[in-house]
């Protein structure tokens, strides 16, 4: 993934300046290699800035993913995504009760007390909440 991403960003850089480049990983992907790509390549590091890692979770199903025990001490990707995120969008809040939503938010805060949490439905989020927010910190991410 990292090599492909670095090559893709280098190609984009040749086309001219962009206001923003949004990267969406597939499902339960480890965000660490993506984030490290911004620091491992001189071309990427000089021309792109990792602004924030935003995680979108499904309010109805996130708890089963966060509490899932993986075989052979494998990493729980859901926990890793939440832990590594700067902002977490809890979507489909209309599909759970207020108590369930409080439980979801509480569990997310238990994994990541630094991230701002936005609860919404139909993925409606003001772009000012997720673009140009300068939330990423490599130091915090390594904690």
Q: What is each stretch, according to the model?
A:
Residues 1-78:
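Nucleotide-state-sensitive switch-loop elements of NTP-binding domains
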Residues 77-143:
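C-terminal accessory "lid"/substrate-recognition subdomains
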């Amino acid at each position: 993934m990292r090599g492909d991403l670095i090559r893709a960003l280098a190609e984009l850089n040749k086309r001219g300046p962009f206001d923003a480049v949004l990267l969406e990983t597939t499902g339960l992907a480890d965000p660490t290699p993506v984030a490290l790509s911004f620091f491992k390549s001189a071309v990427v590091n000089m021309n792109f800035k990792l602004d924030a890692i935003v995680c979108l979770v499904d309010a109805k199903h996130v708890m089963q993913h966060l509490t899932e025990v993986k075989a052979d001490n494998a990493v729980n990707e859901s926990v890793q995504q939440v832990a590594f995120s700067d902002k977490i969008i809890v979507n489909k809040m209309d599909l759970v009760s207020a108590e369930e939503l409080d439980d979801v938010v509480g569990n997310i805060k238990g994994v990541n007390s630094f991230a701002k949490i936005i609860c919404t439905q139909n993925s409606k989020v003001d772009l000012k909440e997720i673009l140009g927010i300068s939330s990423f910190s490599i130091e915090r991410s390594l904690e």
